[in-house]
Amino acid sequence: MKIYNTLSGKLEKFVPLENGKVKMYVCGITPQSEPHIGHAMSYINFDVIRRYLTYKGYRVKYIQNFTDIDDKIIAKANAQGIEPSTLAERNIGVFLDAMAALNITPADYYPRATQEVPKIIEMVSGLIEKGYAYAVGGSVYLRVQKVDGYGKLSHRTLEQMMAGARVEIDEEKEYPMDFALWKATKPGEPSWESPWGLGRPGWHIECSAMSLRYLGEQIDIHGGGQDLIFPHHENEIAQSECFSGVKPFVKYWLHNGLLKLGEEKMSKSLGNLVTIKEALSRYSADALRIFVLSSSYRNPLTYSEEALEAAEKGAERLRQTAARKDNPQFKETAVDTKAYRERFTQYMDNDFNTSAALATIFDLSRELNRIEGEAGKSTDGQKLFKELADILGLSLIVAESKTGTDVAPFIELLIELRKDLRVAKQYQLADKIRTSLDTAGILLEDSAGGTVWKVKK
């Protein structure tokens, strides 16, 4: 299997650090608002990569963080007259609902930056002790000029970075490109005690600390959008390798292309968002997956209603194949399942070529439909069809869940328990209730007014 490594700029044979195991970290959202389909694109792609690695026999440990303290979260919370933590938790709930609705496998852990401050302070202190960072005015900065190979991920020198960036003049810094590991407190902002006074973590150090805590000093795959290559991921490498002394921090860097609306990237700052909730009100989760997977994960993707309508039609064709009932009167007909499986794995082994893998599933669907039209059936072909569809995360469910109303009191009790756990900041247990209910076909939806549940379709 070969994957494209942003660090080397070429396809490389995939050999994990430890035989049979894969440690995978994917940058999560900053929960300042509802998730949009740009997020769906990213997490669908990494979900499929994770599913395929699992299919190949690897034991994948998958971590995805929440940057739940940030300048934008603080500004939005202040504008709404609520605590930043309240805003972040509300949007985290909406995000997890959206991921469940998209049939995205839950992460093994969803660490929150605000819950990892002790580890962050430990890393910042260690970087100061080693001479890579300095404290001034209650803030702490990393000395990028001391970092060996700084710029190796984005393939740029410090001079090129300076020329291509709007560098704010800050008299505190020793060098303009030095970046904050710890920010001194400001009036009205959340803050934590530290050796440098009250303050809060810088963005980049949060992911370094969380990946170190949950995955160790080295990881196999680090994923994220191409807009995170610089400065975020470049700075993660600098911090992590300087702190641990172990190289490489990440063996394979994978970056997905960005979703566009017309000629512009879809983003909060541009205000051209289509939320996942809006998209799912018009199209099925399978249609969104087909839309995303019809292109390489590294390519940009342009959102259009026409493309999604075509994806929905494709999803419906696949659903009809998946829903086919066995007819004992039909003659068993051979399908070359080995050839289909080999095609599928050959494509996926080539940097997760989901477009060609998806085409293989459609070809198999057409053959199964042709066989049925000739009063035949293929038990093995039907089984392989569902297996390959599952690797791409396609549920292809036609019928509604038959969950009855008699379970309502039990579900309401679990919702109350989850609420109490969140108040007690037992977020991992609260998330486990959500994901367990999702597995059982119950979707939770959080809002300012509370939590409601519904049966997934």
Swiss-Prot record:
Gene Ontology cellular component list: cytosol
Cellular location(s): Cytoplasm
The organism's place on the tree of life at top rank: Bacteria
Catalyzed reactions per annotation: tRNA(Cys) + L-cysteine + ATP = L-cysteinyl-tRNA(Cys) + AMP + diphosphate
UniProt motif ('KMSKS' region) ranges: 265-269
Annotated Zn(2+) binding sites: 27, 207, 232, 236
Residues that bind ATP: 268
Principal location class: cytoplasm
SUPFAM superfamilies per the UniProt record, alphabetical: Anticodon-binding domain of a subclass of class I aminoacyl-tRNA synthetases, Nucleotidylyl transferase
Cofactor dependency: Zn(2+)
Motif annotated as 'HIGH' region, chain positions: 29-39
Assigned protein family: Belongs to the class-I aminoacyl-tRNA synthetase family.
Quaternary state and interactors: Monomer.
Name the record gives this protein: Cysteine--tRNA ligase
Organism annotation: Dehalococcoides mccartyi (strain CBDB1)
Lineage: Bacteria, Bacillati, Chloroflexota, Dehalococcoidia, Dehalococcoidales
Chain's gene name: cysS
